[in-house]
């Protein structure tokens, strides 16, 4: 039996709400390793970003290495949800200030999105 088969199918939501850049690097590494362990065909991953975590998407505009990691994860169908409440409260124009965030990535509430995904069977991970 392959290592990937032993884990079965998984649905996971990663929660990011800190502006600590090392946390983002670690979280991206965790997600990459998670996909590698389970197999891309066996996993659905969403990353919900709200509060101070949104500041990390500003950092990405300046860090090509992290940009490539985000791009790689998106190419593996990892979905990113960015909190509209946070964008409004911090007066952030996601089209200008955040790396690779599109209208479809915006969720009304990060916390409500986390709860919804857990109700849909996603396991919660807070790196």
What name fits each language-model region?
Residues 1-127:
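Secreted/extracellular ectodomain signature
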